Amino acid sequence: MGPLLRSSPPPRHLRLLLRRLLSTAAGRPSRLLPLPASSSARLLVRPRVAVAAAAAGAPLRRNGVAVRAFMASTAASEAMQEKRVAGEYTAANVQVLEALDGVRTRPGMYIGSTGSRGLHHLVYEILDNAVDEAQAGYATKVDVILHGDNSVSVTDNGRGIPTDIHPQTKKSCVETVLTLMHAGGKFGGSKSGYTVSGGLHGVGLSVVNALSEALEVTVWRDGKEYRQNYSRGKAITMLTSRTLSDESSSRQGTRIRFWPDKHIFTTTMDFDFNTIAGRIRELAFLNPELTIALTKEEDDLQVQHNEYCYAGGLVEYVKWLNTDKKSLHDPIAFRKEMDGITVDVSLQWCSDSYSDTVLGYANSIRTIDGGTHIDGLKTSLTRTINNFAKKSKTLKDKDISLSGEHVREGMTCIIAVKVPNPEFEGQTKTRLGNPEVRRIVEQSVQENLTEYLELHPDVLDSILSKSLNALKAALAAKRARELVRTKSVLKSSSLPGKLADCASSDPEESEIFIVEGDSAGGSAKQGRDRKFQAILPLRGKILNIERRDEAALYKNEEIQNLIVALGLGVKGEDFNKEALRYHKIVILTDADVDGAHIRTLLLTFFFRYQKALFDEGCIYVGVPPLYKVERGKQAHYCYDDADLKELVNTFPTNASYHIQRFKGLGEMMPAQLWETTMDPERRMLKQLKVEDAAEANVVFSSLMGTRVDVRKQLIQNAASMVNLEHLDI
């Protein structure tokens, strides 16, 4: 691969959002090929296949995106493969992968991907083990260190992994749990070492070991310190021990330090401090008695260090999420234990919020796809509030009731359950399936919420008023919602007039560029490949839906155009990716403050209206070049000042060259826009995904909400990240 360019740093407003919230491209884009100066003329042929670019020396890209830039899955060649003649199939063709070889062969089955998300999942596996010790009542402190050599160590003061010989394996227990799949102390029953835990399958520690170039384990227990080294899942030293001094003889705990295998994680080896901090913050909120410290050691001896301890637990979590909102009451919190299952809930309504935030956890594991605990919460909450509404005659019409969406508008709720034998879906544990949990949660919410609201009639009145206003707004928006549904059914016959659609009707290959204004829209329409690229120009800044209710949202023409053009459906309904008209939605705005503002408004709209777009990997940001440098018959494009400087330094001192700075997409010729920003073989895109939904919610509320003081504080806190010389005002 040729020399690489740096990623363009986000402008002032979006920098805050991208740094704290969204995972973007890992690594640097491949340098664009030098183009002849005459290439600004109209291109007649635009092949999509990667063969032409590869023949010219360009890096191979997949589906219009640089493979190594940010894609989580392993890239596969799109070239046609030769047909193979079927041969004899015998026992000799069957492979038996021993020990942890299967993990190394198919790592994505265990950690989700071999990209940034999978890399960070290794940390979470070890961290969750330490938290399990805290949930069992044995650990009070966990230290996580991101070392300068790209290794990570996690140390807890729990009981320490047992070191005696296991009766079945005839190896030490440490080596057993590190080298064998499904070996652990969390399978439940009388022989289990844990009553409640996030680990269930006995594979977390062994998977991390298998995917690490090196791993060191240190155990303190029984007055001794034990050490052993591993490499790619296999022990390379014996378990050694030494007697601790009298001062340290009572020390207990475990430390795991691992170096990820660069042959497995080929796209990135960098651990992000903020990403890991988001997960640690969650765990600290969920475990009030636990203190977790996070430290990052830099090469220049600088150290980032934070400690997380929240004695208030879920109440503090809700307060943190609603920091910048106008709350209607103090957080409501309650706990119930039944049949060995513990339910903790904290919730609060806010007057200036028009969406709900419901976060569910099972044994401190975030269940991003919900589950029976979330279903039970929503059902019981809706039933309880409706009972109060009818009893107080707030709802006078017997045929009208408040839907769950009306009741939850403006609500922030955290529910955490502890289940002795949880039924998770898959190793990544994204959904809880225990049917008995739903029954217990429903009963807990109904009993405790009813009791609280009866004792606090003022809070009840506020919630009913908020819910009733949501119902009225929904009825007012119903006509517009039906219009959206009608337009969606009619599809092409009712698409927005400014939309330049593509010829393809296959959403998988189709992509749409949302551009800023008619000027940029004109260039983009002329420069695109009409076969699979659509263009939707925006008229100025769209509505900030963070501050408006649903009725205002559907009445806004630009918002309607977005909904219909993209096929987003109606807010609140289940997301259906197949209904999307394009599976790649590219935000393409100018590289100035206004462009950053429009980009942020669009991200706010997508996050609040249909967050699943981020989960499905449909949202991208296009990165146009800032400079065009012409020297002789060659033209080079640079994405930031650092890249420009790097390029100019390659020229002789007496070289003659011309630099053109693009302040807007409208300044670029259609062919230039194609060559640099829209051509799948040359362009750079950043795929945006939400790694931490709670953090994302806080950032959007702070940045786009009604509280000016909170927004000002956020900008001031992040001011040190901005280089004033790079501002384009």
UniProtKB/Swiss-Prot annotation:
Single GO cellular component term: mitochondrion
The positions making up the signal sequence are none
Give binding positions for Mg(2+) 1: E516, D590
Q: Which residues form the Toprim domain?
A: 510-617
Details of cofactor binding: Binds two Mg(2+) per subunit. The magnesium ions form salt bridges with both the protein and the DNA. Can also accept other divalent metal cations, such as Mn(2+) or Ca(2+).
Q: What is its EC number?
A: 5.6.2.2
- Give binding positions for Mg(2+) 2: D590, D592
> Where does this protein reside within or beyond the cell?
Plastid, Chloroplast; Mitochondrion
Q: Which reaction does it catalyse?
A: ATP-dependent breakage, passage and rejoining of double-stranded DNA
Task: Identify the cofactor(s).
Answer: Mg(2+); Mn(2+); Ca(2+)
| UniProt xrefs under Gene3D superfamilies | 3.30.230.10, 3.40.50.670, Histidine kinase-like ATPase, C-terminal domain
What this protein is reported to do is described as: A type II topoisomerase that negatively supercoils closed circular double-stranded DNA in an ATP-dependent manner.
NCBIfam families associated with the record: gyrB, PRK05644.1, PRK14939.1
Q: Supply the name of the protein.
A: DNA gyrase subunit B, chloroplastic/mitochondrial
